[in-house]
Design a protein with these regions (language model features):
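Active-site region of glycoside hydrolase catalytic domains
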Residues: 2-50, 74, 93-95, 103-479
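A common structural microfeature
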Residues: 18-20, 63, 80
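Aromatic- and Gly/Pro-rich amphipathic surface segment
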Residues: 40-72, 76
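Catalytic domains of carbohydrate-active enzymes, especially glycoside hydrolases
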Residues: 65-86, 300-304, 375
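Glycine-rich, proline-tolerant flexible connector loops at the mouths of alpha/beta enzymes
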Residues: 85-98
Length: 479
């Protein structure tokens, strides 16, 4: 890093007047009604049913409760909301037949957003490829790219008068890693690095084609992609092996995707590392010349980057057998991530973690944002599209005192302001999540929301963090 954060002593006292203070959602995690109203199946439906641990129905019942949530947004000064359109609610089979009821649902939802002066920021894919396409290989099959571009183009046309801010994908890294490395998503493949890289590349090609469809179609508004990014630190900054481990995962999660976003191709150092890692699992990455032509053109038209960031990582060298265990229960200390040829996730003494073993180190957000600004000077704007803390929120006497979440958000916003002082252009911040939601791998005991949800009654209760956030949004400053 060429910027010393210790030298940034006077972050701006105020957020800009046009800064968005938002909350984030995802269709499958909030809507419920996963098999009704004409919606087609996704791989998660059968995957979760077979596990028998928890159900995505009714989740937060957002399909029916969205007027309540949006009214609360208006009352609490939340002026932006991240939403996703469930692809299979529009195209039940991914292509072909259109579900008119699903199309109308999103018209009604966006209208309600504007009624309450809450700007919708809309994502087209949030881990929910329609089942028929998933069964053909998901984004490892290039037919899915074609289908996604058709779906995206339909949405651009259909909702042109209601949606200004679009994102193509949510967290391409998480989709690839959870499906092909950690094995916690449908498919359940573990430690296949070549497939993870191929998934990342193909989804970035789909992003590029959708961006060009948006640009060439003359649609008003803006478009970008959301990447899940974490700054990687070597556990021992003086150990070449630890430095290499940190760089390995940095390329896998961050640099490969950011090169594709802002360069439209892959720098030599990126490609060398990616090919070396892919070979560990006995595979290669197919990158066609025509892919790069499309991606280079699209790189000119990214209006912003969405950054989902919850933590950083400390890595040390590891060359043993793959050992991956996801902490999906909140039993602290049970998570393990050791991948042969990449490295091992470790905790650094003195740095706190959550019950789900997530590192709390807000300075990592600063380092990440400055890295993006320095390596990709052609970036235009960044939105923090997810940041937040999973917590076992205690509900007592009609109130939720979630002071640890307030502390977490405040610390991250302070480091965000420091990044803005050194010239990073950030347009807004979205807490994950607006309300308590269904979690893909944790169910319902890991709560993130501003609004506490009683999942039996669907009653919403704003937490202490919601009132704190209202004050920040109204004053546009941190006290």
């Amino acid at each position: 890093m060429s910027v010393n954060p210790a030298s940034v002593t006077n972050p701006p006292a105020q957020f800009p007047e046009d800064f968005v203070f938002g909350g984030a959602t995802a269709a499958y995690q909030v809507e419920g009604e996963t098999r009704t109203h004409g919606k087609g199946k996704v791989a998660w439906d059968d995957f979760l049913e077979a596990q028998g641990r928890f159900s995505p129905d009714p989740a937060s019942d957002f399909y029916n409760q969205y007027p309540v949530d949006l009214e609360l947004c208006e009352e609490l000064g939340i002026n932006g909301i991240r939403l996703s359109i469930a692809w299979s609610r529009i195209f039940p089979n991914g292509t072909g037949e259109i579900n008119a009821e699903g199309v109308q649902f999103y018209h009604d939802l966006f209208a309600e957003c504007h009624k309450h002066h809450v700007e919708p920021f809309v994502t087209l894919h949030h881990f929910d490829t329609p089942l028929p396409l998933f069964e053909k290989g998901d984004f490892l099959n290039r037919e899915t790219i074609d289908a996604f571009v058709d779906f995206a183009t339909f949405c651009f046309k259909e909702y042109a008068d209601q949606v200004t801010y679009w994102f193509t994908f949510n967290e391409i890294w998480a989709d690839a890693s959870n499906t092909y490395i950690e094995g916690t998503f449908p498919g359940g493949v573990k430690a296949h690095l070549a497939e993870a890289f191929q998934c990342e590349h193909n989804m970035m090609l789909a992003h590029a084609r959708a961006v060009l469809a948006f640009h060439n179609g003359g649609f008003k508004g803006k478009i970008g992609v959301i990447q899940s990014l974490e700054f990687k630190y070597p556990l021992n900054e003086n150990d070449p092996a630890d430095i290499k481990a940190a760089n390995n995962e940095h390329v896998l999660q961050n640099q490969f995707l950011l090169d594709a976003t802002f360069r439209g191709d892959y720098a030599p150092d990126t490609l060398e590392c990616a090919n070396r890692l892919a070979a560990i699992s006995g595979g290669t990455i197919e990158i066609l010349d025509e892919d790069l032509e499309i991606m280079r053109e699209a790189a000119l038209y990214n209006d912003y980057l969405g950054v989902n960031n919850y933590q950083c990582r400390f890595l040390k060298a590891y060359d043993g057998e793959n050992d991956l265990h996801h902490n999906g229960t909140g039993e602290k200390g049970t998570g393990r991530w050791r991948v042969k040829g990449i490295g091992e996730h470790v905790n650094k003494p003195g740095i706190p973690t959550t019950d789900w073993d997530w590192i709390i180190y807000p300075e990592g957000l600063f380092d990440l944002l400055v890295y993006i600004k320095q390596r990709y000077p052609n970036y235009k704007q960044i939105f923090i599209t997810e940041n937040g803390m999973g917590y076992k929120d205690p509900y007592k006497d009609g109130f939720v005192d979630d002071q640890p979440r307030i502390d977490y958000i405040e610390q991250h916003l302070r480091w965000l302001l420091k990044a803005m002082e050194v010239g990073v252009n950030v347009g807004g911040y979205f807490l994950w999540s607006l309300q308590d939601q269904f979690s893909w791998t944790n169910g319902y005991n890991k709560r993130y929301g501003f609004f506490y949800v009683d999942f039996e009654t669907q009653k919403r209760t704003p937490k202490a963090s919601a009132y704190w956030y209202k004050h920040v949004a109204q004053t546009r400053r941190l006290d």
